[in-house]
Amino acid sequence: MSDPNANLPVLDTSAGEFKLHEYKLRQEGREWSILHTGTVLTLEAESKIIGERSVRLPYGVALWPSSIALAHEIATREREFVGRTVLELGAGTGLPGIVAATLGATVTQTDRDELALHLCRSNGQRNGVSSIQHRLADWTNWDEPGRYDWVIGADILYGESLHPHLRRIFDSNLAKRGRILLSDPFRSMSLRLMEALEAEVWKVSFDRWDVGEETTPRPIGVFELVPPDNI
């Protein structure tokens, strides 16, 4: 049997060349095609890719289950995204933001990795989306202007030391009546942030998606956060 990824391009990086793979997201009668360096659907795969960071494996452009879950969530909520502005943090392969853009949102994708933004652009073009803005940005030195109806991010809460920086971004870039949509595999540090926000009278709710192989699906929460002034 021929390899369906045989004719896909190779991602050339400072860490070497990485073969790209294709993932197809199907939801609500639509289909999106995303290129990535590999899927990280299980805890075992996650541990492996994190353990190989010493060889500069481009884990940011791998396809993570939280990205798939967030993209599915957005696709099921088309009316809430059409005509809206969206800021995506830690865009990676770009899947959630690309889905939002095809639904009619005006999207700005940010990442601190130029390689990720390169793949975001390529994946946008692959799906017929040319309107997305791409910006290199570091949460610890954030100067992104503008306010957005939605701030979205897939699995961006894994570094607890970065939570204060993310909180400042939420405060500075969320529009009046804006909302935040973050997907996460129920990491302990992420749940602590949710508890802290609830204690500050934020509205916190979530939908659960099971992503991965049928025998061992991984539960992912897509958390919607609304600050007190926007409730």
Report each predicted region and the residues it spans.
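S-adenosylmethionine-dependent methyltransferases
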Residues: M1-I231
